[in-house]
Amino acid sequence: MVRKLATPTILQWPALLGGGKGGRFARTLLVIGIATISTCGITPCLAQGPAATVEVPVIVDSPAITSLRASDPQSPFELARAAQLALDLGRADVAIEFLTKLVADGPEAGALLDAHRRLGTAHFLRFQNNVAIQPVGTEVANRVLEAAANYAADPDRLARLVQQLGDGDSAKRRQASDELMRAGKHAANPLFEVLADPDQEDLHPRARVMLVELGQAIHGPLLAALESDSDTLVASVIQVCGAIRHKAATDLIVGRFGLAPDDSRVAAAAETALIQLAGNAPARHEVELYLRHRAQVYLRPEPMFAPDQQGEVEFWNWEEAQAVETRLPVFDAQVRIADRLLSNLEEISDSPLTPGLANQRLLARLQLAKLDSGLDTPLSEESLQAFAPTSLSDLEQALESALPRRELTPAAIAATEALAAHGDVSLLVTRDKRPSPLAMALESDYHQVRLAAALAILRLDPTRMYAGSSDVLRTLERTATAAGRRIVVIADPHQERATLLAGIVQTVGFEPVVVSGGSALFREAYRTIDVEFLLISENVSGPILTETLQILRKDRRTADLPIGVLADPETLMTREVQTAGDPRTLAMITPQDEEGFVFQAEQLLRSPGRMLVTAEQRLADAELAMTALAKLANQRQRYSFYDLWPLESTLLSRLREGALTEDVAMVLGYLGTPAAQQSLVEVASDTLRPLPQRQACVEAFTHSVESRGLLLTKDQILRQYDRYNGSETLGADTQTVLAQILDALEAPTKGVRFDQPAIAPENRE
């Protein structure tokens, strides 16, 4: 028996083929079809007559498949096993039936665990990797593997297993040991809990043996546990580190060795472990030298650990008497270890740290404080209080030390906030013909540092000119250009290729701006902080590629901006060599489709690491900048040394764009220029704008007229009367807004002719 199907494409044929006798026949038919196509062409052979069809045999179940169906599998174990058997028989369609039923049944975690225990992880990984049974194959695999992972990490179950290590029945002890081995790193904390409890000392030897058996799986948790306040636990952990030759623990063990009294358990365990790890234990006077040297090594920019593709490493902290796993950039992990070593050194040493070490210690503390709060979140009052005893000169030195090093930007930001908290405006005084460290921070290549420095200076509230005052305004102005857009500037003299790429860029959610190169490229790259990255053709017009890149990198607005150099396949290797020294410039082949562009865009956006500023954060920063500018504009006499007039064009552009309209309107109202008043009136009269924006513009215009006088021309004023008179058919809200504009116009002009160019407050009647 056969049924008629619409003619399939060649790519659809494999999905119609199955196993068994019918499958073999279908495969033969496919071979014949391909041979026919190759000899006579697809149109004459497959499209005969007005309704071309082809006869395809129905897939007939083989005896094995029939038997498999008849077994009627029900449990997750039975269904998963039956699905794999169906795959082995070449029937992906039947496997999908079984797996779909498994998902639809919604089994409990216990049933999924039973399937995992009996079939193993590899069984479900095959489901995940088999393209013929997607997406249900991946869904089943994820559910089963998630249930297994949750079971393995269940702390209550693991705690019971640790207690079972002390059972009198050797079989039960062996079972507990096997289960803990399968739990891997998750077994560490329950074992640590026992080792920290003096009342369970009888179980300590077995717990230590279990840690030794776990070996490399718990290297990270062991390092974290060395921070514990429990000497009982620390002594046991040190013993384990020595037994498994955990060389990465050597530095931390030396620190604990230096802190421990000579006759303590920790000192004895550390001495033995250091002999096992390094061949000998250091003398007491050598401990300080060792810690000083190792801390300096960890604070160097060179990586001490092998990172993953994202530049991160697995790191374990000791928090609330537990080892907690996290992932950190390599340098952040190094800073945390250096901070531990320097902290130990401070406790051990009878004398203060040398100035150089004290500076490094402060840098580490600032870095960690900022990382803990978040790069875009101000330090808490508690954190700032921790730096209150630190002298201003030490904080300034730390800031100056951090500025040239990209990896220390969190420390630089924290230093600016700590300096601002001191509230001493003398921090801005120029010394030895050099600007203050805060003023130097305004010239940083990184937006976060520049903005933090500007906000810190404004918090100090200077009332007279200082070195860097113009840079504060430039920083606020550029920050205020954000509108939450995601702009990609494409520089390519080949118009057709650039247009194609722009279409791809727009499809995936970015806003393309196409230029051929030269001055247009620099203008668009500098225009707004919303530019997320640049795509520059190797054949860019204007300055040659290498000069173009140099110019962009020397300007602080684009110094850290990701740049993709679009190259031909033949020249790609050359461009890779040319850009190898700049980790934020990547050579790439011009993408031809969305998938290729998304892959390359992800690479580019990963290159700045944590210094990448998202569209949401840019918009939040713009609000901060506008608030600061509003304060300066509102108190013009107090802050007369700030020249706000150059900001007018930027603010007018922002008002037209519609982002942060309320904040921009406020600043323009305080600025009180003719162009500002005209723009406020135009936006307030625009019925397509949201009502809150229009009301904000009316309020700002009213304030501007009251403080600066009416600066509109006669024609502009008469236009507002025409608008009001023509608003009979408009809504009540619009009529109210237009009436408020007239109220503001008429307040200072009563009894004055409209042909007067402007009416200043001092000339009013």
Annotate each language-model stretch with its function.
Residues 81-88, 97-101, 114-118, 130-132, ...:
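Structural detector for internal amphipathic alpha-helices that build alpha-solenoid repeat scaffolds
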Residues 96, 108-115, 152-163, 185-196, ...:
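Amphipathic alpha-helical scaffolding segments comprising HEAT/armadillo-like alpha-solenoid repeats
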Residues 111-114, 118-123, 293-344, 369-396, ...:
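Short coil/linker segments at helix-helix boundaries
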Residues 484-506, 534:
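Conserved acidic segment of CheY-like receiver
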Residues 509-517:
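Short hydrophobic/Thr-rich beta-strand motif most characteristic of the beta2 strand and flanking loop
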Residues 516, 566-610:
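Output/docking surface of receiver
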Residues 516-533:
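Acidic, metal-coordinating helix/loop segments flanking the phosphotransfer/catalytic sites
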Residues 533-554, 559-560, 566-575:
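Conserved phosphotransfer microenvironments
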